[in-house]
Structure formats: C-alpha cells, structure tokens
Amino acid sequence: MGKTNDWLNFEQLADDKVREELKPPSMYKVILNNDDFTPMEFVIDVLQKFFSYDIERATQLMLTVHYQGKAICGVFTAEVAETKVAHVNKYARDNEHPLLCTLEKA
C-alpha cells in the first residue's frame, strides 16, 4: 500500500513542476503604419481581409491609422503575428502600395 501512495505523491509533484514550467506564449501587437500614398479603401480592404473586421470596425481602425499615424490591428502569438505582417506587406507590395505592417512585443 505504501507504493501506491508514493506513486500518487510522485504524480502530484510532477504535475506541480510542469505547471511551474509552463508559461503563456509571448504576445505581439500587429500594427498598421500610416503613409501618404496608400488609399484609405485599400487599408480597409487589408483590415477586412487579414484581420476579419467588419466594415465599420475596419473604417474606425483606418481612421486611427490616418489621424494618429498607426493602429493596433490585433495581438497574437509570435508565429501568427509574423505571418500576418508578412502577408499584409506582400499584399501591399503586390498591389503597389507602400503600406507598412509591423509588430512589437505586447
């Protein structure tokens, strides 16, 4: 019977150690930066296409980019943020716009 209790104690200690070692992933803000050349309609398109915002929210964020110089499009894990930044920047270049999407640690 002592062996069963030892096993249960070991499992509890192992579970506690794993919980201590688990950390939430680092999060990153994906940011759209203003420029003087990208049309507002294109920025709205980007916000809808890559961040799934409805037209009203996309318009609000586009105006934030326009008037404040930048806007946070969302906060994501590193891999998701990097992918979104790469896709947005490629889409902008493919459409011959200088729109710049960046990320920074949240």
Swiss-Prot record:
Belongs to the ClpS family. Gene3D superfamilies: 3.30.1390.10. GO terms for biological process: protein catabolic process; proteolysis. Involved in the modulation of the specificity of the ClpAP-mediated ATP-dependent protein degradation. It comes from Erwinia tasmaniensis (strain DSM 17950 / CFBP 7177 / CIP 109463 / NCPPB 4357 / Et1/99). Transmembrane segments: none annotated. Pfam families: ClpS. Binds to the N-terminal domain of the chaperone ClpA. This is ATP-dependent Clp protease adapter protein ClpS. The gene is clpS. SUPFAM superfamilies: ClpS-like (SSF54736).
